[in-house]
A protein has these predicted regions:
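Short, compositionally stereotyped local motifs that mark structural "simplifiers"
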Residues: 656-783, 787-789
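Aromatic, loop-rich ligand-recognition surfaces of beta-strand-rich domains
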Residues: 773-837, 851-901
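Accessory carbohydrate-recognition regions in carbohydrate-active enzymes
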Residues: 1-320, 324-368, 374-423, 431-457, ...
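Short proline/glycine-enriched turn/loop motifs at strand-loop junctions of beta-rich domains
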Residues: 125-127, 689-695, 798-801, 819
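Solvent-exposed serine/threonine-rich low-complexity stretches and specific carbohydrate-binding patches
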Residues: 835-845
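Extracellular Ig-like/FN3 beta-sandwich strand-entry sites
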Residues: 212, 715-719, 865
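Exposed aromatic-hydrophobic patches
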Residues: 202-204, 708-713, 852-860
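Beta-strand-rich extracellular modules
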Residues: 220, 723-727, 873-875
Length: 901
């Protein structure tokens, strides 16, 4: 049950290795974050047993084809058909789950094959037994269908929307005894065929005390015929036989790594971790090879197994490197799946789920998986096609890639999470370069090697942190502990060491081994407190290291690169011993589809892949006396606590890094230093760079470039383009910055307090004449939570004014709602204010699309005023329909520009 409590988000039900079916109880139907797997150990009510579940994700989905046994009069209200249960009557082992439903005294036993879920219900009381099929369980039902074949067999179709926007599941449900339909909820066709977006049926029969009823549910992603064919996996009704076969599959699978250990807790932690790495990705094709592609069409099998559920932002780090050791064939199948998704969906997967691209998280980390496999000599897929697909992902123009290609980094002006995206794109580009090198593609190799050094463009040599840039300069104020929209689920501490492709270059940028060691020490020894946005994923803090989320996972191993392996071992063992427990809350963060557990498996073995794409394992000290790795080819290798040795068929800790050649090297872009993005009369600026010998060249408003000898002064709105020359014929990419001369000399006194994450450049940002876009994550909006907004604009002298406007943004999914109303007041002395007007909001708070609204008023005749007060009333507590209601969430006001004429 490790990970079923706390924030682990694992499920306890039955499945087989990499199986299509995950048959597990559901205790959460509210879409809550800690209920992403459908189950949480703190709960006391089971609502049903569904056949698909996600292991440790941070988004909710699945829960398909839910069945629930009850007794008495059937009811379709989950609160009525749900049943209390006790953990003392619950058992979960590999391939088997059982529980007693207290409400009607029913014993439930579950097991599976790859594509079939097998239920055994024991009704301990005589009477009317029901099996509820509720297709509205958890996800939004787009299209439901139930076809009655006979009293023992039905076909089911469930097309649903949640995280995956258009998911298809087909099922064949078989009962070992005939049932009658006793109740129906249906808003569509009725008869032998039931359809609709509200669909539930109750199947009923009389039972004797102690009577067993068996149910088989076969899944298919392609159609009813696929489900019929897949049902051949389980012939007959011998539940114990199927349970034993599932257990045998797990025995074989888990014996791929054998450890010698007497501590039962450590054994349970290790093998549960190994188990968690093997419950996904999931086979997503029928027994005859047919599968549903990313184009939503059904395709014939092509000689490999097609899979789904690729949490690549997480799993490229440790789970997929682990698979290269013990799942070489599946690794090739995963990659062949990637390539089919590229062919049928237009690009490689980012976070694929049930033939849907969710576009969750960042990077194009499928290239890491492919490069790692190629580096380690894994075959069974087309290297040339893999390279073409990888290059395609890197050359797209979305998600900040256009700016990244143009200027060598992503700015806040271009895209949110700009720092994280720049760093992860750079690593992925290095992976593509390694693929090009294997295929002797010299030009591609040099191009992507140069791109892989783009991390240098966001590294601040003064502070030693990866920092966001805005308008060509460093964004400020800057706090490396602050979690904000410039980083993906983290802060600068947790991203400033992510240069796995160029660790020697990173160490050099920090000032050498000693300074790099000091920086690592500072991270681990800092106060374990973050600032800015509350981020539920950032857990397991050691200083600012956060083991509960993936960006930190390689950091403890960086001491190895500066000759301090004892510090690596110390940190790794602390994490192993403190953040993994044999308890339901035994994971310090989300399991994340096996990544959290893969870190444990590899680290406890004394190895880790810091740089996937490089045929190299980094050592630490193993925690077990003996570790035997059994490979697919029948060979095995023995590792020991004292020494891993070079027995895994690839190099160990050689650090054979090759410094980029001049043709591959990158000259970092210069940084522009200016007081702000806007100015009243004139503004000066200067350039700076890590290399103090760099020369700078600039162009103002598309004039010829010229060398900068001294600082410049602007006195009108201007766009500056600039680059640096390192003196050896290597120039940087060209960066542009635009500075605006303000349309007036107004000043503003903001009475409210904005959230530091959403400062929009400070108070002057509200009267600078620059309007924000609907992508508020770029940082152009000021945010105020749990308070009204109030500010006074000083026009500097009494003027005739007749036009008043203030601009607000709504993104209700992010708790940003329009103010209920905006009031405008006038004054000549800043003491006595007269209400001019009140503008009511007319934007529906339930509207999903990001929306901008000007709360404007035009007076019928001019008003004499020097001071204009603007007051916007906060929406307040999030309403009951809102996803943040259960968190007692308070709405934000987002404002950008106040205009007075």
């Amino acid at each position: 049950m490790i990970g079923t409590g706390g924030h682990g988000h694992t499920y306890p039900g039955a499945t087989v290795p990499f199986g299509m079916v995950q048959l597990s109880p559901d205790t959460r139907i509210d879409g809550s974050w800690d209920g992403c797997s459908g189950y949480h150990h703190d709960d006391s009510v089971i609502y049903g047993f569904s056949h698909t579940h996600l292991n440790g994700t941070g988004c909710t989905d699945y829960g398909d084809i839910m069945l629930m046994p009850t007794m008495g009069e059937p009811n379709f209200d989950p609160k009525e058909y749900g049943s209390k249960f006790s953990h003392s009557n619950e058992k979960a082992t590999a391939g088997f789950y059982s529980v007693k439903l207290d409400k009607h005294n029913i014993d439930v036993n579950l097991t599976t094959s790859t594509r079939v879920g097998f239920h055994q219900y024991v009704f301990n009381n005589a009477g009317q037994a029901n099996i509820i099929l509720d297709l509205n369980h958890r996800d939004k039902l787009l299209e439901g269908e139930v076809r009655i074949i006979d009293q023992k067999r039905i076909w089911v179709k469930r097309r649903s929307e949640a995280w995956a926007k258009d998911q298809y599941v087909f099922a064949l449900i078989e009962f070992d005894k005939p049932f009658e339909i006793s109740k129906v909820k249906c808003n569509g066709e009725k008869g032998r065929r039931f359809t609709g977006t509200e669909l539930a049926l109750s199947f009923t029969r009389k039972v004797k005390k102690g009577e067993k009823i068996l149910v088989k549910v076969t899944l298919s992603p392609t159609g009813f015929e696929g489900a019929e064919n897949n049902s051949s996996e389980i012939k007959g009704w011998d539940f114990n036989k199927v349970k034993k076969e599932a257990e045998q599959l797990w025995d074989k699978q888990l014996s791929k790594i054998e450890i010698t250990e007497t501590d039962k807790d450590k054994l349970a932690i290790f093998y549960t971790a190994l188990y968690h790495t093997m419950v996904q990705p999931n086979i997503a094709q029928d027994i005859d090879g047919k599968y549903r592609g990313r184009d939503n069409k059904v395709h014939d099998g092509e000689g490999f197994d097609y899979y789904s559920v690729f949490s690549l932002w997480d799993t490229f780090r440790a789970a997929h490197p682990l698979y290269t050791l013990i799942e070489k064939k599946r690794t090739a199948d995963f990659i062949n799946t990637f390539l089919k998704q590229y062919e049928q969906g237009g690009r490689l997967p980012v976070w694929e789920l049930a033939s849907n691209e969710t576009d969750c998280m960042i990077g194009y980390h499928s290239v890491s998986v492919m490069a790692d496999a190629m580096a380690k000599g894994i075959t069974g897929f087309d290297y040339e096609k893999a390279f073409a697909a990888a290059k395609h992902s890197a050359m797209l123009d979305h998600l900040g890639l256009d700016a990244y290609k143009r200027q060598g980094f992503i700015s806040m002006d271009d895209e949110h999470e700009s720092v994280s995206k720049t760093l992860e794109y750079a690593y992925d580009d290095w992976c593509i370069a390694q693929m090009a090198q294997i295929l002797n593609k010299k030009e591609d190799y040099e191009y992507f090697m140069k791109r892989s050094q783009s991390w240098k463009n966001i590294f601040d040599w003064e502070t030693g942190f990866m920092r966001p840039k805005k308008n060509g300069g460093w964004d400020k104020p800057f706090d490396p502990r602050e979690i904000n929209n410039n980083y993906t689920e983290g802060n600068s501490w947790q991203y400033s060491f992510f240069v796995p492709q160029d660790i020697p270059g990173m160490i050099e940028a920090y000032g050498g081994n000693d300074k790099f060691e000091a920086k690592l020490d500072e991270m681990f020894n800092s106060e374990s407190k973050t600032t800015g946005r509350e981020q539920v994923d950032v857990t397991g803090l050691i200083g600012q290291y956060a083991h509960g989320n993936e960006p930190s996972h390689h950091m403890a191993y960086l001491y190895n690169y500066i000759g301090k392996p004892e510090k690596t071992t110390d940190k790794v063992h602390y994490i192993l011993n403190n953040f993994y427990k044999n308890t339901p809350d035994g994971l310090i963060g989300n399991e994340d589809c096996g990544q959290m557990s893969a870190w444990y498996v590899l680290s406890s073995m004394g190895i880790y892949s810091v740089t996937p794409g490089k045929a190299e394992w980094i050592e630490s000290k193993a925690t077990f006396d003996k570790i035997k790795v059994n490979f697919e080819n029948g060979e095995s290798e023995l590792l020991s606590k004292n020494s891993v040795k070079n027995r895994l068929g690839i190099s160990m800790t050689k650090y054979n890094w090759i410094k980029p050649k001049l043709s591959e090297s990158l000259t970092p872009v210069p940084v522009i230093y200016a007081e702000s993005k806007s100015f009243k009369n004139k503004m000066g600026f200067v350039f700076d760079s890590f290399n103090k010998d760099t020369e700078y060249f600039y162009s103002i408003n598309n004039k010829e470039f010229e060398k900068l000898d001294i600082g410049l002064v602007l006195n009108e709105t201007s766009t500056i383009k600039f680059y640096s020359d390192n003196g050896y014929g290597k120039v940087s990419d060209t960066v542009s910055a635009t500075f605006f001369k303000k349309p007036n000399n107004y000043t503003i006194d903001i009475k409210s307090t904005y959230n530091p994450q959403y400062h929009a450049g400070g108070k002057e940002g509200l009267i600078d004449g620059i309007n924000g876009s609907t992508n508020w994550r770029k940082g152009d909006w000021q945010g105020y939570q749990s308070q009204d907004f109030e500010a006074i604009v000083d026009l500097q002298n009494v003027k005739e004014v007749s036009s008043f406007s203030s601009t607000f943004l709504q993104d209700q999914r992010s708790w940003i709602l329009m103010p209920t109303k905006v009031e405008y007041y006038s004054s000549t002395d800043n003491i006595n204010f007269i209400l001019i007007t009140s503008v009511e909001n007319d934007v529906d708070p339930k509207k999903d699309e990001n929306t901008i609204k000007d709360f404007s008023f035009k007076a019928s005749k001019p008003i004499n005023a020097r001071y204009i007060k603007v007051k916007a009333y906060n929406f307040g507590r999030l309403p009951e329909w809102h996803i943040g209601y259960h968190d007692k969430g308070e709405a934000f006001i987002f404002i950008d520009e106040i205009t007075i004429k």
